[in-house]
């Protein structure tokens, strides 16, 4: 979809004149805002970004203010909770056209912020004439080495995640020349796979979302400053289908079917040729097949092993040997990436990656040794593990009816209760909400059910696994013992569990530097046996049985 189509607005220069046939939404500085054409401003929403630039965004019927702002492609989205009104990341301050506050505004933002004009953009419809101000956007991380133009050919490995996009620029020897990561620009459509699929069911929505990622990749290719010969883009089936503008109807309702098998080179507008890893099943995609390439064709673990790619969609491979594998997938939601939780966020400087128990309570372990700003997924796992050990929580995730330790009694005494449920104050002005515990418990139930089902299908017991390899959200900052105590892993398996980092990105890089492996990976994919959990008539009963910690 070209700039200026669909979500694009009327471009304005600083004098308010239309600049000919130029496409896209134009920004003007705050000093020039007074001369922005009032007619155009009245037809859309005026957004003032953190640098003072004004963006005039068109309003589409039925859209929330969050969708209007962050599906425009003009502003970097925060990590949103799919419009549930829980995370507070979509907060904006109204300068004109302030709507009446809703219950979620008051509960999440607080009375003082609401009086100051702050609202949750996901809870209010976009109305022409509104003027809002945004807080600073999330930063994009980049690492640039000394890129020598004569060191090519250069290739770009991409891990296209639902939440984040990670990339590595490889030189002609296969070494990393630059790298970066950013939130997926499709976040305006929601943080979960199901939200993206809903937005992509029609052609216009699919093109809109695909265009956001294509524009991001075009910018990366342009910014590295050297010719890029080829890409390898590894993503889950939903992200890949949207990127390739393939019909997603088969992923939206049972019986699920896959229209894009991958294992081919795709041509994308304004980009070098992109190889798409094979997608073995409707919700087992190129991200985990690339991860398997990294393990199988690098230094493979002893068989049998399990690879769990813990993203918004959980994908699992139980490899019996180099040719035979059982695969499964379960929707996990973005909780393990810290998204959708009250103080959640991606793992970055200022994120709490763990909690320690001491005689005086909980102390956070912060990435970068700075003041805590948010809690990443592993931080939440560590926190719940600590609260279970003290007796503050019971196995169902509820507050304990009777304290079993002095520390639990002290913590229970600090609990605050309100219309939205209970919350526990934490260091750094943060808090844990009862709803956060429930979200993590859902992830635990899905994870342990998938593992149990794969073991049953393969005829193995957990003690037969030589290794459990964790990728995705748990690949970098794995809680050392929490997974077993929380019940994600059977007893005795934690000692054989390894955080493998970003296996998807590592595999994409390998498939660029050793293209002869691509056909082998396609053969591996075609030989996988799917364990279809969603098709089981007893799925709900089994899932509920796993809705306990430990």
Language-model features: where?
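Fe-S ferredoxin-like electron-transfer domains
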Residues: 33-36, 40, 45, 59, ...
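Acidic, glycine/GT-rich loop-and beta-edge segments that sit at the periphery of enzyme/chaperone cores
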Residues: 39-46, 118, 277-289, 510-550
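Local cysteine-cluster metal-coordination motifs and their immediate loop/turn environment
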Residues: 76-98, 114-127
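Short glycine-aspartate micro-motif
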Residues: 155-159, 228-232, 305-309, 325-327, ...
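Glycine-rich phosphate-binding loop of actin/hexokinase-like ATP-binding domains
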Residues: 167, 174-192, 250-265, 290, ...
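N-terminal phosphate-binding loop and adjacent alpha-helix
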Residues: 185-224, 340-343, 351-356, 439-442, ...
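ATP-dependent carbohydrate kinase catalytic cores
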Residues: 256-325, 359, 402-451
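Catalytic phosphate/nucleotide-handling subdomain of diverse soluble enzymes
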Residues: 460-463, 467-524
């Amino acid at each position: 979809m070209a700039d200026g189509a669909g979500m694009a607005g009327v471009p304005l220069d600083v004098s308010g004149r239309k600049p000919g046939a130029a496409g896209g939404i134009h920004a003007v500085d705050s000093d020039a805002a007074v001369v922005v054409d009032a007619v155009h401003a009245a037809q859309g929403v005026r957004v003032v970004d953190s640098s003072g630039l004004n963006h005039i965004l068109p309003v589409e019927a039925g859209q929330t203010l969050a969708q209007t702002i962050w599906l425009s492609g003009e502003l970097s989205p925060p990590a949103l909770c799919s419009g549930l009104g829980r995370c507070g990341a979509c907060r904006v301050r109204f300068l004109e056209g302030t709507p009446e506050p809703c219950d979620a505004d008051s509960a999440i933002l607080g009375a003082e912020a609401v009086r100051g004009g702050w609202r949750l953009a996901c809870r209010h419809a976009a109305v022409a004439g509104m003027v809002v101000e945004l807080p600073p956007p999330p930063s994009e991380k980049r690492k640039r080495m000394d890129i020598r133009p004569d060191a090519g050919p250069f290739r770009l490995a991409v891990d296209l995640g639902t939440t984040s996009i990670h990339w590595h620029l490889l030189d002609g020897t296969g070494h990393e020349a630059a790298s970066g990561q950013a939130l997926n620009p499709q976040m305006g459509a929601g943080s979960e796979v199901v939200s993206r699929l809903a937005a992509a069911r029609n052609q216009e929505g699919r093109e809109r979302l695909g265009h956001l990622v294509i524009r991001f990749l075009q910018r990366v290719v342009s910014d590295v400053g050297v010719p890029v010969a080829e890409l390898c883009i590894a993503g889950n089936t939903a992200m890949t289908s949207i990127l390739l503008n393939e019909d997603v109807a088969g992923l939206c309702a049972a019986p699920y079917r896959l229209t894009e098998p991958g294992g081919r080179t795709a041509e994308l507008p304004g980009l070098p040729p992109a190889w798409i890893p094979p997608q073995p099943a409707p919700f087992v995609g190129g991200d985990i097949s690339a991860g398997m390439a990294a393990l199988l064709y690098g230094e493979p673990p002893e068989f049998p092993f399990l690879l769990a790619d813990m993203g918004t969609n959980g994908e699992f491979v139980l490899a019996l040997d180099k040719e035979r594998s059982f695969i499964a997938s379960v929707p996990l939601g973005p909780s393990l990436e810290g998204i959708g939780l009250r103080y959640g966020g991606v793992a970055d400087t200022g994120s709490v990656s763990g909690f320690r128990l001491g005689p005086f309570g909980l102390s956070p372990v912060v990435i970068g040794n700075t003041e805590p700003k948010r809690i990443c997924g592993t931080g939440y796992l560590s926190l719940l593990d600590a609260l279970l050990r003290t007796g503050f929580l019971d196995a169902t995730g509820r507050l304990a009816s009777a304290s079993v330790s002095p520390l639990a009694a002290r913590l229970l005494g600090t609990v605050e209760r309100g219309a939205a449920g209970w919350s526990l104050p934490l260091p750094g002005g943060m808090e844990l909400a009862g709803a956060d515990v429930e979200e993590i418990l859902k992830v635990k139930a899905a994870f342990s059910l998938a593992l149990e089902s794969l073991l049953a299908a393969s005829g193995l017991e957990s003690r037969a696994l030589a290794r459990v390899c964790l990728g995705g959200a748990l690949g970098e900052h794995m809680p050392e013992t929490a997974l077993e105590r929380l019940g994600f892993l059977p007893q005795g398996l934690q000692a054989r569990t390894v955080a493998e980092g970003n296996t998807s990105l590592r595999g994409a890089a390998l498939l660029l530097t050793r293209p002869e492996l691509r056909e082998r990976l396609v053969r591996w994919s075609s030989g996988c046996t799917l364990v279809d959990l969603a098709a089981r008539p007893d799925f709900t009963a089994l899932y509920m049985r796993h809705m306990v910690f430990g």
